[in-house]
Amino acid sequence: MIRVAIPTGRMLEQALDFLRNFDDRLLDEEKGRKLRIHGERFEVFLAKPWDLPLYVEERVVDLGIIGRDVIWEQEKNVVNLISLPFGYCKMVIAGYPYVSLKGNGKEIRIATKYENITKKLLENRWGKIKIIKLNGSVELGPILNISDLIVDIVETGKTLRDNGLEVKEVLFESSACLISNVVSFAYLRKEILSFVKEVRKLNDKCN
């Protein structure tokens, strides 16, 4: 049986529905009461999104389903197997309409939970940036005037608009992806590659 971690939160239902395409023994009634769901093919663990890559890296589980944005931010030593047809979102720079992306030599304050991504993508462009690491609602950065801009993922942009903010630039698009532990990929190579082949067929049907 392959151990799979899926993220709690916005992608939970999508990830479970996705896995049910390959294991119909993953029952709904177990969800909500347990952090572990037993199927015929998979043993599924529900994990916080930001903890999930660590569980895969440390081989607590064999596979994980997580947003590509989290993988790029954390840079864990895992095998990135294939993109999945859900969890679509965009990594954006956002701020109040009157705030310019041109720093004009001034330090730009950026609130984000994606500290590494922000540094890699924007430090060379603007030079003088101050990253304010927030773990909660990064929209509070501009609202409380502790940042000029934010870098965050958005799906519809409604939360930004509700708080008077707008998308200034899309940095990249993200979706869910399937990742594997390095050792598990070696020892369970046949089973994992067979699963990836099935996933690829499902992806083709969705496109």
Swiss-Prot record:
EC number: 2.4.2.17
GO molecular function list: ATP binding; ATP phosphoribosyltransferase activity
UniProt catalytic activity: 1-(5-phospho-beta-D-ribosyl)-ATP + diphosphate = 5-phospho-alpha-D-ribose 1-diphosphate + ATP
GO biological process, one term: L-histidine biosynthetic process
Pathway: Amino-acid biosynthesis; L-histidine biosynthesis; L-histidine from 5-phospho-alpha-D-ribose 1-diphosphate: step 1/9
UniProt keyword annotations, A-Z: Amino-acid biosynthesis, ATP-binding, Cytoplasm, Glycosyltransferase, Histidine biosynthesis, Nucleotide-binding, Transferase
The record's note on its domains: Lacks the C-terminal regulatory region which is replaced by HisZ.
NCBIfam families on file: hisG
Name assigned to this protein: ATP phosphoribosyltransferase
